[in-house]
Amino acid sequence: MNLSVKDSAGTPLYRQIYDGVARAVINGELSPGEALPPIRTAAEELRVSVISVKHAWEELERDGFIITAVGRGSFVAELSKEELAKKRAALMKERLYEGVGFCKSLGASEEEIQKVIKELY
């Protein structure tokens, strides 16, 4: 798993880890049943606290991206194409909701927001 985090990114470390793993699952970079590194190993590799990785793993499990078997570790969940599409849409909506909300607080109209999104895309 090729994952990196930046302490100065403005996004909590656990969320950066969550996003990286979720993205890898959705894009097929991580296969169903594939083992994730143990929490301590991932923390060492990413140079973050065990708590940050544990929090990310718990959120990923809660959202159905991974499963954890006591004593065996955490593994990528078996997800159908439809389930992956739903998870992808949910993550996009979550991120866009935050951004659109901020733009609205600046007084931007729907048309202005759509124009900016189109420019960025």
Model-identified regions with their sequence ranges:
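Extreme N-terminal segment that seeds HTH/winged-HTH DNA-binding domains in transcriptional regulators
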Residues: M1-A35, T41, K87-L120
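Beta-hairpin "wing" of winged helix-turn-helix
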Residues: E29-L30, E34, R62-G71, A77-E78
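Short, mixed-charge, low-aromatic patches
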Residues: G10-Q16, V50-E59, V70-V76
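N-terminal helix-turn-helix
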Residues: L36-I67
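Alpha-helix termini
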Residues: T41-A42, L46, L60, A77, ...
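Short, cationic-aromatic polyanion-contact patches
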Residues: Y14, P38, R72-R88
